[in-house]
Amino acid sequence: IMPNQVFEKHVWAEIDLDALRQNFRAVKQRAGELPLCAVVKADSYGHGAVQCARVFAQEGASWLAVSCLAEALQLRRSSQTLPILILGHVQPTYAAALIRDDITAACYSLPQAKALSEAAQAAGGRVKVHLAVDTGMGRIGFALRTDFDAAIAEAIAACTLPGLEMTGLFQHFSVADDTAEENIVYTAEQHALFVRAFHALKAAGHEPQTVHCDNSAGVMLHPDWPEGLARERCMARPGIILYGYDPSDEVRFGQFRPVMTLKTVVSMVKEMQPGQSASYGRRFTAEKPTLVATLCTGYADGYPRQLSCGKGIVEIHGKACPVLGRVCMDQMMVDVTGIPDIREGDEAILWGGSVSDTAETIARKTDTISYEVLCGVSRRVPRVYLEHGKIVDVEDWILKA
């Protein structure tokens, strides 16, 4: 079967699988002998989980991590055979699906464990679980910081329930990507609690097979964090760095290549005369003859409306073009006065070019993080997968549906 290589050049996201491979290898080199669990939740941060998981599997990933059951089933239906961990909530009623497709669930409280145990027994099997402990994130997990002994007692009780097979232990750092002194201390406290939990479970006869606490910042900054744990059982769990972005402005490594480039095309070019205005609210009025290009993309595709009125920078013909007026749902306008040879159909780079914005600069301009910018690219935007500069596949959710 030939890969789908056809897509409408309206707005699309180019996914550089060579960059993805390079990023994985860079993390692997830093992690040393630690196995890697590649985080592919949220459709691989907007990049396309099926294709990204395929690359990670080829490069030697040991696990894949997702957020929900649907994401796990998508991977299984794409013939993905790597172990899959659901980091978030799963309804116990879906225990049969977890068993059938060999998907590992997070177990994060005794009531949740009991419900999952009952459902697993009714399904006639055992659900594999990784215990999630809350060392300071404040989300799901046995609450070690509130009452360590009580939380460990509940975790041990969960391990003894019929229908459950405890195979792992994990937690999540809340400020590992922050270099403020108090946050460095807080991260160390989280790690110490996690180590303490591991040894408490081991002493009770429930030593986890797999232990993981390192996120992107953790694996890069602290390759020594398996210290205090059984190193042969440890695993790192990188996320955002696999897709080419640093965890935060404070924690930067400068060795990862952004994987996604968001592109669109020019749909019309016109010259606006002094006094003429553009877009909703008439927020832009020309003070001099201005060449304006309309682009066939907008906030419905994931280009933030906060980049209206000159905040956003688009690249056309290698030149920086500021956004004019407000970004619309499906269209936007940019100033192309310095590009006299521009034509309808010309390519425009929304982010990821040499002079355009990046997901990180957009995040700064819109008071968010690169994660949200990447995840915000909507499903009406085809993902175009490239290897060695050539299209190897296209994923178009609208046409597939």
Segments and roles (model prediction):
Residues L73-S79, S248-F256, S370:
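C-terminal helical cap(s) of enzyme catalytic domains, especially alpha/beta-barrels
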Residues L20, L75, L169, V266, ...:
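Residue-level signal for inorganic ion chemistry
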Residues I86, V266, V323-L324:
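A structural signal for short, hydrophobic beta-strand segments that form beta-sheets
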Residues I1-T104, E118, R126, E165, ...:
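A charged N-terminal "starter" segment
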Residues E271-A401:
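C-terminal accessory subdomain/extension
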Residues E8-K9, A42-E59, K114, E118-K128, ...:
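Active-site loop/helix belt of alpha/beta enzymes
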Residues A70, G88-T93, S109-A113, V133-T135, ...:
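Short, acidic/turn-prone active-site loops that include or flank metal/cofactor-
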